């Protein structure tokens, strides 16, 4: 929404996308751990995006110009994909953040646990001025958790999404949502608590296996040109095990996919018929 976010223009949009592209490229080309995608101590910024983030160069000098440069992150409001403006913006609504979209994205794209589709006829949150001023987004979303049909999925999905409430709808850091205090704390379905985005990233990076499995499945899908099936599961698990034994290096992921049977041996019509 150009009225609510006048600083969001084509230059900022392009800078957001370039940061993510350069960051992923660095993980790949430098053969870094795939866990850097969850949290890292560096990113790539130009003047436009650095101003948006409120980040200076390590020497304290402002970052100047349109060219992107690698920047160390002395404080950890940023780091990894989850707190990059590109992801935070695409998982927001036009006028506000969306804990549901952000939580769903993290479950699907990071943890590999996509929630089921919502039941029919669930109303959207009212967006009129009176509703918005009546309480924080967390308070207004309590309606989802009061509906038994929504409660199970929204309990974890919303909690993960709320962890990113310190970032507004275009990914700028904030301490308050309007006049309301932000509470980014939550917990996973297993009861593990986190205090906000940094804590959430730390827990995901420590657990490692769910993200490694999720990324393996997505990379394998890309390599095969099809979705993974139940018969691919042993291959996925073998790749995850090899990743663990090799410090989760990106090159290990690529090499193991290329060496895998699903990649090397195309399933023919007869084989598929037998499987059915």
Show which residues each predicted segment covers.
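Core structural elements
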Residues: 223-227
């Amino acid at each position: 929404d150009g009225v609510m976010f006048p600083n969001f223009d084509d230059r900022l949009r392009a800078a957001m996308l370039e940061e993510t592209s350069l960051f992923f490229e660095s993980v790949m080309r430098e053969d870094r751990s795939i866990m850097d995608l969850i949290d890292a101590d560096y990113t790539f910024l130009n003047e436009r995006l650095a101003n948006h983030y409120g980040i200076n160069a390590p020497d304290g000098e402002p970052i100047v110009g349109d060219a992107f440069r690698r920047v160390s992150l002395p404080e950890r409001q940023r780091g990894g994909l989850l707190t990059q403006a590109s992801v935070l913006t695409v998982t927001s609504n036009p006028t506000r953040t969306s804990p549901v979209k952000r939580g769903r994205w993290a479950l699907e794209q990071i943890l590999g646990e996509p929630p089921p589709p919502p039941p029919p006829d669930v109303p959207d949150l009212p967006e009129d001025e009176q509703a918005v001023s009546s309480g924080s987004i967390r308070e207004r979303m309590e309606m989802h958790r009061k509906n038994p049909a929504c409660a199970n999925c929204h309990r974890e999905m919303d909690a993960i999404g709320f962890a990113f409430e310190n970032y507004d709808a275009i990914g700028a850091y904030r301490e308050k949502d309007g006049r309301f205090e932000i509470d980014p704390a939550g917990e996973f379905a297993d009861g593990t608590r986190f205090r906000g985005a940094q804590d959430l990233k730390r827990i995901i990076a420590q657990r490692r296996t769910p993200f490694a499995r999720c990324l393996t499945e997505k990379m394998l899908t890309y390599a095969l040109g099809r979705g993974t099936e139940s018969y691919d599961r042993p291959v996925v698990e073998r790749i995850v095990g090899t990743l663990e034994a090799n410090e989760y290096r990106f090159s290990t992921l690529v090499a193991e996919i290329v060496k895998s049977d699903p990649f090397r041996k195309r399933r023919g019509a007869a084989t598929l018929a037998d499987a059915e």
